[in-house]
Regions:
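Domain-level signature for proteins that mediate thiol-based redox and metal-cofactor handling
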Residues: 1-164
Length: 164
């Protein structure tokens, strides 16, 4: 980029950074990218992991650095914030749509409702991303990553993950 770079231009660049574990989504889609501000000539980029200790965060930081440096932007710092903790409520509707297209069931309830269900032992229904059936069951609370659970659809006989 030439000339003065503003916050909106940096946000546009960062909106293209893909999540390394789910490359169909950007870090903005997932709500990992929390904020970009300009303070004293330095862009402060705030990110929040989907889970504390998420192994993808270092790759995400490196990808952010690469995107900005390729555009000639070196006046930035990346700040990882774990409080407040990430919530699926931060995901964009576009991100949820992309998850489903990718074959992962998007979160179907708010984080608050999900926590209430965990406390009370009440299970929430998860819609199959392949056939849209609600005739599904949890097979494991953890999928390929800590932020996903493994389910099985009794209608189309497909295993699938749910983003939790």
């Amino acid at each position: 980029m030439t000339g003065e770079v503003n916050v909106e231009q940096v946000k546009v660049l960062l909106n293209g950074v893909l999540d390394p574990e789910i490359p169909a989504l950007t870090i903005a889609d997932l709500g990992i990218l929390r904020d970009v501000v300009l303070k004293d000539g330095v862009f402060e980029i705030t990110i929040t992991p989907t889970f504390t200790g998420c192994p993808a965060m270092r790759v995400i930081e490196e990808d952010i650095e690469e995107v900005l440096r390729l555009e000639g932007i070196s006046n930035f710092k990346i700040k990882t914030v774990i409080a407040p903790a990430w919530t699926t409520d931060w995901m964009s509707e576009e991100g949820k749509r992309k998850l489903k297209e990718y074959g992962i069931a998007p979160p179907s309830v708010s984080t608050e409702d999900h926590l209430k269900a965990m406390i009370t032992g009440k299970k929430h229904a998860v819609q199959c991303p392949f056939c849209d059936s609600m005739n599904t069951r949890l097979t494991s609370p953890f999928g390929s990553t800590a932020c996903k659970a493994l389910h099985y659809c009794d209608a189309c006989h497909q295993p699938f993950e749910e983003f939790k």
